[in-house]
């Protein structure tokens, strides 16, 4: 036993050993902590690694999530162009293909995805990462081919339709390339092939050159003006026609005409009417007419000359002249407002004043004033003429010849002495007092109305109707008539005449009430009345017996086997009757009534006086 250990107790030994172990552990812990701190900073060189690819994948994934969210909001069909960038890019489970797909509208979805899915095949995409784009190039091309094949199967009918309609687009493009202007700028569209027009523009493709040359001569038979210019194009020979036909024709007629002459199909022709009120279109055709390569026949169409000629432009600038319109209506015997408006509007292409009339905003006012002025002139002219002059004027307006014996045979057929009738008719025309009214009485169907109405049309008389007797103005037509007819007078009519019109039947002046005017002093013109009431034998109207010349038509009007009149009573018959019995009726020749001066035509416009020949 060690002497140094003598006197050491057990408790002190344990304490000493415990202190030694604690000191050893603390030193060892310090050494370990120093070794850990020394490895905190690594000064060795670091390699780059694949951080760029990781960043590109993260950006692509974020962009794909943004696209998916946008499509969900817009309710677009889901199409993922980046299928396998990462396993996280296709989180949505696959859906079963629908049994029937609805065609997309005009490529709206494809435009959005096409901008996102475009990848540069040579250098890759810097935004999405070149490595990922290159890895998907093979699969995207394969999927693209499948989509193209499916699209061709679904849209095969649409492709054929577009191919058929594109033929016209190709023709229009060729025309614009050759002439530098669109065909639609020169023509207006007729939707109906049956609509007729005198002017047509035709563009023919693929016709043979010799047929185009032959059409220059063949079309002259049906056209007043021809303009033809030929060119060569990828479809063959192209011919541009501007035609003005003698008669208006429809598109079907013109197409059939070109098919016979040029031997071309329907889809090889473009046929439309020209824009006749377009100054650029008129200028184009005017310049084309002065081209050395153009074939010309006839004069320049009026609608081109009207817009390109200075003379025509000056005429169009002239204001409307009412006196010229009144002169036209007077020369053509138009007094009806509807006829004046219609026929004068038709002259707009020929008369500059008629064209100015159509440009006016108050056409109704001009028409009413023109009709009123024409009636004034005609009435004054009629009053100035004697009965002989008036009959001669009316007969000159009737063309043709008739048989005067038809009237004589009809009078004899009614058992009337012709000489007695002729004497009364002569007094009637000269308005002899107390012999100013001729009455034809008889049963129905004896030809009374036919006899007097044919005379009324010959002498341009007026008709009175007792149905208007409640009006104060029902006798107003007598103011502007050389002869008047009152057909089928009944007993109330004779009672009215016996009460109010005795002086009128005498031929003396009476006061006639006029609408919107003061009463006028006039003498009744010769009056012819037809009736079924025998006034001459009725004592009730005893005061009318001396004022009436009465003849009875007792026999029914003769008819032939076919039910047509056996005797012809018309204007030609009366014309021949007056010419034959002119002297017997004491009618004088117009030359005998003049003072020797040559008659001059009536002129109511301010136009220049015609030079004497």
UniProtKB/Swiss-Prot annotation:
Span list, region Disordered: 1-31, 128-152, 588-613
Region (DNA-binding region): 150-317
InterPro entries xref list: Helicase_SF3_DNA-vir, P-loop_NTPase, PPV_DNA_helicase_E1_C, PPV_DNA_helicase_E1_N, PPV_E1_DBD, PPV_E1_DBD_sf, Rep_E1_papillomaV, Znf_lg_T-Ag_D1_dom_sf
Any one of the GO CC terms: host cell nucleus
Post-translational modification: Phosphorylated.
Residues reported in the UniProt entry to bind ATP: 442-449
DNA-binding listed as a keyword: yes
Segments carrying motif Nuclear localization signal: 71-73
Modified residues (Phosphoserine): 77, 92
Entry keywords, A to Z: ATP-binding, DNA replication, DNA-binding, Early protein, Helicase, Host nucleus, Hydrolase, Isomerase, Nucleotide-binding, Phosphoprotein
PROSITE patterns associated with the record: SF3_HELICASE_1 (PS51206)
Biological processes, Gene Ontology terms: DNA replication
Biased composition (Low complexity): 129-152
Cited function: ATP-dependent DNA 3'-5' helicase required for initiation of viral DNA replication. It forms a complex with the viral E2 protein. The E1-E2 complex binds to the replication origin which contains binding sites for both proteins. During the initial step, a dimer of E1 interacts with a dimer of protein E2 leading to a complex that binds the viral origin of replication with high specificity. Then, a second dimer of E1 displaces the E2 dimer in an ATP-dependent manner to form the E1 tetramer.
Quaternary context: Can form hexamers. Interacts with E2 protein; this interaction increases E1 DNA binding specificity. Interacts with host DNA polymerase subunit POLA2. Interacts with host single stranded DNA-binding protein RPA1. Interacts with host TOP1; this interaction stimulates the enzymatic activity of TOP1.
The name this protein goes by in its record: Replication protein E1
Organism of this sequence: Bovine papillomavirus type 3
